[in-house]
Every structure is written in structure tokens, then in C-alpha cells.
Amino acid sequence: MNRTDGLVQRRRVVNSSSGSGLGQDGSNDISHNDKLSGHGMDTDCTMQKDLNSNPKIDESQDSDKETRLTLMEEVLLLGLKDKEGYTSFWNDCISSGLRGCILAELGFRGRVELEKAGMRKKGLLVRKLLLKNDAPTGDVLLDEALKHLKETDPPETVPSWIEYLSGETWNPLKLRYQLKNVRERLAKNLVEKGVLTTEKQNFLLFDMTTHPLTDNLAKSRLVKKIQEAVLSRWVNDAGRMDRRTLALVILAHAADVLENAFAPLSDDDYELAMRRVRTLLDLDFEAEAAKPNANPVLWAVFAAFTK
């Protein structure tokens, strides 16, 4: 693998662009200043901890004093330029990637489940996503997605929901399920948590709200967690990895922001990290989902981005 033909070259192109922003989340997602009625703190931490705990390897055991971020917030934080405070204009994967994170987060919190494979052994991509618990999570985006899931009958598949929530469906009746201004709303969450700040930048003909990084430690911890997962703490067994970290690696790759975490690595470590990421992407997701204590929702989300 020639790093200069991949990561470095792409980063130069990205850094040279200035016409990007947070609001490009679907064809109708163009407003950068959408005002939210409020962001509640996560009131579901206990359930989340129980669902994500792994007795073999728990990479979050030292995170009690750290800022708690959702999977969506972590992926967005990876994609944001630290000083500029916006995502790359050239990244057309982050929109759907963030919607996948939303479904995975709902799976972590026990709000959704995948229908049983049954006697016909249905594959992950055709099994329906079912509402398991419609209790509010305390997160505006998650609760909005839950509301859409509750209103939909018959249930839909995970790939369909990623399309609906992204607004990338050809079915006009499903456009009402689009989650709008996702990047801006997640950025505001990170502002409230003290990770980002809010500024106005002028781009020739228009002003744009940006969210530069203020908590460098939070970003450093996130990058370190990803690097260690595929380097010093690599276990070569997805079943032994912390589930949330596994989801972060795969969905950051789906959102095309994973390489941002590998930028500081040496060439040798970079190539090793990318080989191990490829190992995860090449797993038999159907077999992994069938293992005891597996969360089929997660594997269905992963499969939706690697089909």
C-alpha cells in the first residue's frame, strides 16, 4: 500500500477546499442554522453500559471521567477539521454513515432489534428492524428516529432505514423520514459538552456557522482509542473486541473519516492498521451475528455498508 497515493494525497485535496460545511446531510438538508428546542443529556447510561459491557476486553473502563459521546458524535468529531470546524466538502459518505451510527446506537441501547432469521435463515440485509422499546433516550436525534420507527408499519430493513433517514430514497412517501441537519445538530451537542465551540466564517458570498475544536484532549482520546484497537490492543477476534469500539472503527470507515485517525501514524503502522481494518470488513457478518451474545442489529448495519 502506497500511503502517499492514498491518505496524504486526499488530505491535501481536502485541506485546500473551503466551500464545505456541516449541513450537507441529504438532498434537502441545506440549513446550517436550524434551532433545536433543546438537547437532553443521556438518561439511559445504565442500560447502555449493561448492553456494551464485554467481560473479555472493555476498552472504555477508564472513561468514567471522560466526556461521554454517542457513536454519531464520535464519527462527526473524526470528520471535522480541528481549526476550521467543518467537514470535507468532498466527503459524500458521512451523511449515510451518521445514519448508520444512529441505528447502531439504538441497538446498543436496546431500543431496536432484528427479526429472527427463522427456518429460512434470512440474511441480515432482508431481516426487518423491529422496535423493541420506545422509551425516550434523552437524545433528540435518537428519539426522532425512534418516532419514525414506531410510525412505520410494516417494518423495514436496516438498509432501507439508512436510505430513509438520509433522504436518499426514490420513494416520495418515505421522504418524511429524513433526519435533517444531522451534522449541525450533532455539532451543537458537542458544543454543549464543551468539545467544540461555535464561530461564524465568511466564504465570499455567504456566512457559515462552523464549530472548531476546543477540547483537544477529547479528540486525542478518540484517535488513540481507534489506533490502539487495531494496533497495540488488536486481538484478531471481533468477538473479543469492545462492541462500541468495533462499531466506531467500521462505521468511521463507512463514513470515510477513519483515515483521519491514522494520519499521525508511521507508514508501517498505517499499513498495519489498514490491513487489520480490512480484516474486520472481510468478516462473515452473518456468522458473527449468529454467535452467542452477538447484537444482530450492529452486524446488519455493518453489512449495509459493505454489501
Give the location of each predicted region.
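Glycine-rich, aromatic-bearing surface loops/beta-hairpins
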Residues: 212, 216-307
